[in-house]
Amino acid sequence: MNAGSPKPRAPACDRNRDPILAVLRGHFAGRRRVLEVGSGTGQHAVYFAGAMPWLEWQASDVAQNLPGIRAWLDDAGLANTPAPLALDVLQPWPEVDADAVFTANTLHIMGWNGVEAFFRGAGRVLSAAPGGMLAAYGPFNYGGGYTSDSNRDFDAWLRARDPQSGIRDFEAVDALASQAGLRLVDDVAMPANNRCLVWRVVSSASG
């Protein structure tokens, strides 16, 4: 991003940030550091870090998106937002000491191999974090069906654009989370036919 160029902006982030925050504020209350995977423009990182100052909010994304994220972080000047990390879910992840992972509107964009890699990576990050949490926001299908006509249309648009992308089945995603050592603790209906899914690390004591 060139000096003086406007920060990237996604209108959807302005619309969904408060409903997401209402979920995260409760589930991340006892957490200390969040790794956000796929921070996109950086809007969520700034908003959530400002609203939850007890958390260190570690933004990350593929390298080409980092300048825009830095622009948001630098403009906000928050003490709890370190420099964003380059993270491609299909490549080795950087070492991050985090006890929560968050992602928004990414699982339907990446291919299924990316979704699998995301849950493996998140599971590794959280494996040493007792009570670690993973939250994912976006559209999901249930029982093999769409939750709305608009989601059906959106899925068709996604697959026409990239056959590897598409709205994911909740059951398949939850199975990946389980394989990564996580158990679903919340599934919250959100505006515009989205969901916020929250998993917790399964402690060894609970088997």
Question: PLM ranges: what are they?
Answer:
Residues 1-29:
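Class I SAM-dependent methyltransferase Rossmann-like catalytic core
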Residues 93-101:
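A short acidic, Gly/Pro-enriched loop at the edge of an enzyme's catalytic core
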Residues 129-141:
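Conserved beta-strand signature within the Rossmann-like core of class I S-adenosyl-L-methionine
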Residues 35, 43-91:
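Class I SAM-dependent methyltransferase SAM/SAH-binding core
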Residues 110-122:
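A short, conserved alpha-helix within the catalytic core of class I
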Residues 30-40:
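Conserved class I S-adenosyl-L-methionine
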